[in-house]
Amino acid sequence: MTKKLEGKVALITGSGRGIGRSIALKLASEGAHVVVNDLDEAPAQEVVAAIRAAGGQAVACIGSVTAPDFAERFIGTAVSEFKGLDIIVNNAGYTWDNVVQ
């Protein structure tokens, strides 16, 4: 039986932990090829390893969504590794260094 997202390519920011990790694992379980992102390499690689262990395809793209070159590099990873892009989940967040009033 074909999975719902078979062959689709998904980018997920902030997917090394928490909700982003859960989204990455779910999309992969539905057949999507996943590009995992996190600021830290270890959590991102753990998610990639979990997806691969379950028979899915995934790669990591480490970096901050606030970096000027990030979007191009993130999308470039999807295109070079999986030949396309179908789904983007913007799960990453950031905070200001000051109190917001």
Provide a role label for each language-model segment:
Residues 30-46:
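Conserved glycine-rich Rossmann-like NAD(P)H-binding loop of the short-chain dehydrogenase/reductase
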Residues 54-57, 77-90, 96:
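A glycine-rich helix->loop->beta "capping" turn
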Residues 47-55:
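Short, conserved SAM-binding/catalytic segment
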Residues 36, 61-62:
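Conserved residues in the N-terminal Rossmann fold of short-chain dehydrogenase/reductase
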Residues 67, 72, 95-101:
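Conserved mid-core segment of classical short-chain dehydrogenase/reductases
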Residues 3-35:
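Canonical Rossmann dinucleotide-binding motif of NAD(H)/NADP(H)-dependent dehydrogenases/reductases
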Residues 41-45, 62-76:
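The beta1-alpha1 cofactor-binding region of Rossmann-like NAD(H)/NADP(H)-dependent oxidoreductases
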